[in-house]
């Protein structure tokens, strides 16, 4: 299975896969050497150091973490490991009688706050 076991050196040229990102801005689950979504089995010591730096205790300081992300992004751009071929947006239609609805990333209680302002169904 090429998704979990690295193929032979000459078995393939391109791997195409997709995933969605977690709300935690860590790239470990996508690009670390043992990541399940690292479909191309990319492994680079400099990127590994960058990933570990992003998630280190020092990165609890937002300024430090931002700088660590910038370095990681620069290194990833140099290596061109990932070439985006697709982009999508999520569309969530909500009518006027829905209250308490938010798609904000920081909202942790959406489903306990959402409701409707009327028992009467919306007609338009």
Curated annotation (Swiss-Prot):
It is a lipid-anchor. The keyword DNA-binding does not apply. Belongs to the bacterial solute-binding protein 5 family. It comes from the Bacteria. GO terms for biological process: peptide transport; protein transport. Part of the ABC transporter complex OppABCDF involved in the uptake of oligopeptides. This is Oligopeptide-binding protein OppA. GO terms for cellular component: plasma membrane. The keyword Lipoprotein applies. The complex is composed of two ATP-binding proteins (OppD and OppF), two transmembrane proteins (OppB and OppC) and a solute-binding protein (OppA). It comes from Lactococcus lactis subsp. cremoris. Its main location: membrane. It is found in: Cell membrane. Keywords: Cell membrane, Lipoprotein, Membrane, Peptide transport, Protein transport, Transport. The lineage of its organism: Bacteria, Bacillati, Bacillota, Bacilli, Lactobacillales.
């Amino acid at each position: 299975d090429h998704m979990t076991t690295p193929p032979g050196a000459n078995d393939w040229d391109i791997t195409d896969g997709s995933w969605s990102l977690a709300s935690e801005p860590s790239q470990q689950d996508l690009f670390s050497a043992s990541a399940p979504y690292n479909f191309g089995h990319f492994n680079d010591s400099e990127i590994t150091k960058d990933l570990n730096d992003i998630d280190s205790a020092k990165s609890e300081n937002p300024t430090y973490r931002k700088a660590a992300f910038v370095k990681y992004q620069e290194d990833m751009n140099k290596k061109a490991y990932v070439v985006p071929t697709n982009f999508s947006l999520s569309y969530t239609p909500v009518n006027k009688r829905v209250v308490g609805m938010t798609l904000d990333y920081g909202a942790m209680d959406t489903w306990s706050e959402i409701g409707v302002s009327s028992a009467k169904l919306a007609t338009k």
